[in-house]
Amino acid sequence: MAKDQLQVLNALDVAKTQLYHFTAIVIAGMGFFTDAYDLFCISLVTKLLGRIYYFHEGAPKPGILPSGISAAVNGVAFIGTLSGQLFFGWLGDKLGRKKVYGMTLMLMVICSIACGLSFGKTANGVIATLCFFRFWLGFGIGGDYPLSATIMSEYANKKTRGAFIAAVFAMQGFGILAGGIVALIVSAGFKNAYPAPTYSAHGKDSTPPEADYVWRIIVMIGALPALLTYYWRMKMPETARYTALVAKNTVKAAADMSKVLNVEIEEDKATVEKIEENGNSFGLFSKEFLRRHGLHLLGTTSTWFLLDIAFYSQNLFQKDIFSKIGWIPPPETMNALDEVFRIARAQTLIALCSTVPGYWFTVAFIDKMGRFAIQLMGSFFMTVFMFALAIPYDHWTKKENRIGFVIMYSLTFFFANFGPNATTFVVPAEIFPARLRSTCHGISAAAGKAGAIVGAFGFLYAAQSTDPKKVDAGYPTGIGVKNALIVLGCVNFLGMLSTLLVPESKGKSLEEMSKENEGEEENYGTETKGENAQTVPV
């Protein structure tokens, strides 16, 4: 138990796992289900958008999105997410977690539907409308990151807190999987209802007019899970840690948690007064914050930034990589709906076999192995498998070796999710003071989305062939897939090194990790090494 801890917070820390824990996981997790669905489903339909809106009569290949437009469609939601993480992270500390939580969800619901209703007289007009609503969709999604993580960390007990926060994040895997399954069902249904020839046989006829409904339906379905959880989000009480430590209303915090835990909680007035007298109140831009948490914030931001460069590059452009190794046939040999079906099938298999299991391995082991060990291990194996793909890349492009490529590629996803993709979400929700927790998580997550933007825009160009004859229309020559994968391997290695800045929070209360109740004059530098300090001397 942390020094002079409030009874209500201690009650939460030692509470047995019970129904309200799982209720909180589902309520917060469905937001992440929607987040992942909305952010990743666009990669399933970008080739279809190109066929519908950028078809050129007589061209040897189907239409594709021009380079700048493709980058915008893929990247604009990330820019919105980054903005939302910073804004709602800050707002969650100012107004409270609960008050802001409903705003983010309604924004996600409204904008998911609006994306599917994108309109315009020209192709560019439709895409511009889509990008506008995807920005605001991302803005709402961004708010869900710091708020969901903070709420779950502040509700959880210290013994299984890591598993609970990771379980919320693991719903992202189901969101990615659901995006693929929905795309499979919708494209298969339309493909059977509206048969079409291949592009090489009949050009424009390979994209039936009804294909315009396919991408809209896929995009709009993302609103349903969020809409279903709105009522329950509004019924959740404010977290006790915000009410007691930030709003300074220990009586209300005790009353709220008495109902949740079904136990009587009474605060000792002397303890409350002592905490209020001895507690710290430094701000985000103070020297005291820099001294206590500066390296922690550097660690959480740098690891998340580097991870997302690689993670989102792989996720958003796996369809292009699979095409280049021949796992998905050339586009001219398929019709539009068949192409959506095959891309969705490939991404669903990857999600089912590696992405989803990786998340839940983290849930199972995070409170046994610890955050640091999982993050270091995951970063190490991501580096190993990425170089194993990149260096003998020509070997993997041969037809007889394609299955091996897919297996190796899947393993990089597995160790991303049984590794830094999960732990970078968990740790910032545990190591900062309550009054700055949501803000610092938002800053860390925004650094991650900055990495995603680098990946989404950079990899799109970098992976283009070095041979001008093999470059996609409208793109400059790049460094090729092989060299792009080598760069991602180097990024993973840097992520492994930056993990050394992240402290271990396994088995400790949030107040113990953040030194919430220690005065600003106390000697912060005398803490013991090991689990109570940095994972390594820095």
Curated annotation (Swiss-Prot):
Keywords: Cell membrane, Membrane, Phosphate transport, Symport, Transmembrane, Transmembrane helix, Transport. Coiled coil: none annotated. Residues 46-70, 121-122, 186-211, 314-345, 393-402, 464-483 are extracellular. The chain crosses the membrane at residues 25-45, 71-91, 100-120, 123-143, 165-185, 212-232, 293-313, 346-366, 372-392, 403-423, 443-463, 484-504. PROSITE patterns: MFS (PS50850). Although related to the sugar transporter family, it does not transport sugars. This is Low affinity inorganic phosphate transporter 3. It comes from Petunia hybrida (Petunia).
